[in-house]
Curated annotation (Swiss-Prot):
Family that this chain belongs to: Belongs to the UPF0502 family.
Cross-referenced Gene3D superfamilies: Winged helix-like DNA-binding domain superfamily/Winged helix DNA-binding domain (1.10.10.10)
Organism: Serratia proteamaculans (strain 568)
InterPro entries listed in its UniProt record: DUF480, WH-like_DNA-bd_sf, WH_DNA-bd_sf
NCBIfam families: PRK11239.1
Protein name per UniProt: UPF0502 protein Spro_2794
Amino acid sequence: MKYELSAKEARVIGCLLEKQVTTPDQYPLSLNGIQLACNQKTNREPVMELTESEVQQILDLLLKKHFLRTLSGFGNRVVKYEHRFCNSEFGQLKLSAAEVAVVATLLLRGAQTPGELRTRTNRMHEFNDVSEVEQVLTNLSAREDGPFVVRLAREPGKRESRFMHLFCGQIDEAPAEAALENDTELTQRVSVLENEVAQLKQQLQALLERGTHD
């Protein structure tokens, strides 16, 4: 997949996708508007504190990757930025409104369960139930031009699996699986040692009792 965004680039794209839907009268966004959106305290995970120069550098990189375009002139006193990430005239990535809502929220908040996504996308798209969110996630994970999301291993004690976008590259879960295997192996070794200690205690007790009788 040709979409390889850094975490900060993903934040900028997520903000533009979100604001295009939630505040269309303020979209496209200025440099200052994008900085405020990136550093927003709500609906962001992790919370970032990007400087204006950092945001400008990110915008310049995204322009080179053709994920953004600038709008200036015609009454605009400042340069405005709009995304070309999806649904642009000549772009290949086409997403439905529901898919845009899910992708934007994953870009802004990282891995989430379908239930969390349903709640957090409500300003961008209204899902009737969690199954609709799950269907969108299934579609995004099975697309021929994707996959764009992946189901993560369920965390211990959690009822739902989380999903993560793949626009920053593949998710490597092997370490988590290896850790689980190591934990299982360690548990087995401890159990064997406990049995051996118990047997030694029994043998020692038997020797002590025999010595007492002698």
